[in-house]
């Protein structure tokens, strides 16, 4: 339901998507669906013969897709170049290593840096849970610093605003809900909360530290006597590092059967940077989310 709203927001805007190394089955399926549902206009970079073969095998009804024929090793550079020149509006990773694509994206020659931290934001639609959860960062920053977490919160708030949340509630999550000097994450959480109170982080309500149960269950928060507007009502979860965030993301997807959409924000254009294990549906929703910000 929530993710379909993103699809509706992206539909019909004609945003051009540069797909770097599009010679991948799941990528082609997701991009075709995005084209069919008018979420974007794909431009496929990579070996034309292989891309055409995949299209003919999987989606033969897709006639005359725009393909820029090039060797796989050139696809990333040419796709980023197209985005840099304004020929395309946003970027998607295909059959290319994440590190290789982001190294090209961050090359100063292409002018796509903004000075902000680039981070992954994921929207999770969980069965029987009353609202979407926005989490960061399950796939980009290995061990984000305090300063980087400020930018992560800003990116998440932008996504929440697009989804209709005017003042989202942000929980900085760790293992416990009290400050413990032996656990630096809890001290960072308290600092972020105070920065929000002093107006250094705007447009949201930030509180922490919290354990996960305290921010998704009002009952759990009440049992522990936690009084906070965020307790049990969080819209955004800021996780301590990529390991915690990635484990939560995959637990929600594979165990709780959540649907998801992810995008990389912080550069001049968003990047669709999904995992090979992600489903065609996840890739499709990620294209839609990124198109909204393109």
Swiss-Prot record:
Organism the protein comes from: Thermotoga maritima (strain ATCC 43589 / DSM 3109 / JCM 10099 / NBRC 100826 / MSB8)
Biological processes, Gene Ontology terms: acetyl-CoA biosynthetic process
Top enzyme class: transferase
Gene transcribed to yield this protein: pta
Family designation: Belongs to the phosphate acetyltransferase and butyryltransferase family.
Subcellular location field: Cytoplasm
Domain of life per record: Bacteria
Oligomer status and interactors: Homotetramer.
Name by which UniProt lists this protein: Phosphate acetyltransferase
Pfam families per UniProt: PTA_PTB (PF01515)
Annotated catalysed reactions: acetyl-CoA + phosphate = acetyl phosphate + CoA
Major site of localization recorded for this protein: cytoplasm
PANTHER family in the cross-refs: PHOSPHATE ACETYLTRANSFERASE (PTHR43356:SF2)
Pathway: Metabolic intermediate biosynthesis; acetyl-CoA biosynthesis; acetyl-CoA from acetate: step 2/2
Temperature dependence (free text): Optimum temperature is 90 degrees Celsius.
UniProt keyword annotations, A-Z: Acyltransferase, Cytoplasm, Transferase
Enzyme Commission no: 2.3.1.8
GO MF annotations in UniProt: phosphate acetyltransferase activity
């Amino acid at each position: 339901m929530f993710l379909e709203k993103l699809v509706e927001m992206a539909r019909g805007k004609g945003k051009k998507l540069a797909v770097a190394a599009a010679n991948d089955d799941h990528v082609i399926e997701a991009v075709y669906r995005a084209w069919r549902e008018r979420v974007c206009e794909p431009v496929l970079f990579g070996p034309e013969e292989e891309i055409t073969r995949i299209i003919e095998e999987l989606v033969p009804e897709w006639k005359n897709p725009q393909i820029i024929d090039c060797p796989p090793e050139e696809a990333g550079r040419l796709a980023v170049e197209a985005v840099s020149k304004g020929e395309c509006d946003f970027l998607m990773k295909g059959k290319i290593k994440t590190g290789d694509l982001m190294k090209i994206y961050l090359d100063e020659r292409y002018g796509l840096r903004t000075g902000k931290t680039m981070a992954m934001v994921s929207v999770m639609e969980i069965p029987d849970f009353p609202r979407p959860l926005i989490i960061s960062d399950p796939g980009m920053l290995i061990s984000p610093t305090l300063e980087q977490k400020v930018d992560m919160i800003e990116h998440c708030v932008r996504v929440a605003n697009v989804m209709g949340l005017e003042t989202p509630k942000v929980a900085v999550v760790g293992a416990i809900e009290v400050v413990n000097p032996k656990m630096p994450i809890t001290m960072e959480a308290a600092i972020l909360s105070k920065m929000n109170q002093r107006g250094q982080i705007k447009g949201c309500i930030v509180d922490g530290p919290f354990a996960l149960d305290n921010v998704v269950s009002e009952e759990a928060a009440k049992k522990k006597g936690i009084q906070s507007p965020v307790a049990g009502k969080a819209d955004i979860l800021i996780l301590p590092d990529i390991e915690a965030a990635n484990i939560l993301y995959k637990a929600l997807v594979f165990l709780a059967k959540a649907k998801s959409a992810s995008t990389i924000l912080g550069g001049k254009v968003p990047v669709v940077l999904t995992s090979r294990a992600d489903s065609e549906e996840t890739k499709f929703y990620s294209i839609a989310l990124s198109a909204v910000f393109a």
